[in-house]
Amino acid sequence: MSENKAHITVNNKKIELSVRKGTLGPGVIEIASLYKETDTFTYDPGFTSTASCESKITYIDGDKGILLYCGYPIDQLAEKGDFLESCYLLLYGELPTKQEKIDFDRCIMQHMMVHEQFTRFFHGFRRDSHPMAVMVACLGAMSAFYHDSIDIKDAQQRMIAAIRLISKVPTLAAMAYKYSIGQAFVYPRNDLSYAANFLHMCFSVPCEEYKINPVLSRAMDRIFTLHADHEQNASTSTVRLVGSSGANPFACIAAGVACLWGPAHGGANEACLKMLQKIGSVERIPEFIARAKDKNDPFRLMGFGHRVYKNYDPRAKIMQQTCHEVLKELNIQDDPLLDIAIALENTALNDEYFIEKKLYPNVDFYSGITLKALGFPTEMFTVLFALARSIGWVAQWKEMIEDPAQKIGRPRQLYTGYAAREYVSIDKRISKNKMTTQ
């Protein structure tokens, strides 16, 4: 990495800071000495201009629409490989050889079963519990069921925990779905692929044979690959921050799942489907398009544009292709929401307003439609996102633990509250709050 210097003057004191340049993307100013030298912090709400770590895993260029896993473009990985190949890549930094792929796949498939006591653990939840609430609990509980792999200082235990998370999260996700609809849990099968196994555990029933549709299985696999990692987003940063305290890996991933549950992060595809429900019919699309263009109208089209990608989301093109393959394979012709989605897509792609502002349908738009076509209810969408992102969280956590520069996260603040004041006895206080109790 090349290095030069930045100079900053604070309170008439000029200091010199190192500037580091990565392989790709913007450089960073190292500010660790800023507080010591100037008694001043930097202020960056949301950390949108702050690099919290050094990483070799995922790179994003939002202006150019680039997403790389360990240097490999996402479209190549999704089209030419499969999800477990991307898992290996994110975990080890290189694509596997043929034999390494065979061994890794076998290892994952042989660890997909979960402890049998998990079946009783599920019965502690209401049937109408949100699946994400169940997943947060299950991921945290894994440290109780698999406490032989929670020593983060042991490299072998770290890798065992990583393998267990990649292999068992789809089983737990399928169990959460089955429990919510009152059906029997389905055990994984070692002869099926990762994605096919997940579909089998979700949709097969004991009374009849479930046949794997290769088109649908491939679509599920692509969805997993496209969502495997996305640099230092909110949930990944949460995993790293929790992990910096020395928490066990299962607790860290549970924290990531909890963060992903937030509608501003992982709930975008679910929000997109709810928007389609709000539109209601193809005939009302022009009305909502007009509302989306009106700056004074609070309505926003979900699933269009992206906070990071100022150009086209590189995952969207593959997801669009996959979406249409699924719709064609299933020959869905009488689903009102899918009709609205397809019509809305065509309208937006040909509307000058959306073209000029580069508000293209993003990966959430197409993945939401695809998941609905596959038969998943909207409340499962974020669970599937968490399933796919588990490998990214695991890889980022592992990288952080193995970083010699790693230390516990401790963000600072700009304090704007009261200065020191004297305690007032309760009989002399005057209420300044408008609190109501019931």
Curated annotation (Swiss-Prot):
Q: Does the keyword 4Fe-4S apply?
A: no
- What intrachain disulfides are recorded? none
What does the UniProt keyword field contain? Transferase, Tricarboxylic acid cycle
Group of enzyme by EC: transferase
Which GO terms of type biological process are on file?
A: tricarboxylic acid cycle
- InterPro entries xrefs: Citrate_synth-like_lrg_a-sub, Citrate_synth-like_sm_a-sub, Citrate_synthase, Citrate_synthase_AS, Citrate_synthase_bac-typ, Citrate_synthase_sf, Citrate_synthase_typ-I
Region forming the signal peptide: none
Pathway in which the depicted protein is active: Carbohydrate metabolism; tricarboxylic acid cycle; isocitrate from oxaloacetate: step 1/2
Record field: catalytic activity: oxaloacetate + acetyl-CoA + H2O = citrate + CoA + H(+)
Top-level taxonomic group: Bacteria
- Active site annotation, chain numbering: 306, 364
Under Enzyme Commission nomenclature, its number is 2.3.3.16
What's one GO MF term for it?
Answer: citrate (Si)-synthase activity
A GO CC term attached to the entry: cytoplasm
PANTHER family the record matches: CITRATE SYNTHASE
Q: What else is known?
A: Citrate synthase is found in nearly all cells capable of oxidative metabolism.
Q: Which NCBIfam families match?
A: cit_synth_I, PRK05614.1
User: What family is this protein classified in?
Assistant: Belongs to the citrate synthase family.
Q: What is this protein called?
A: Citrate synthase
Tell me the organism's taxonomic lineage: Bacteria, Pseudomonadati, Pseudomonadota, Alphaproteobacteria, Hyphomicrobiales
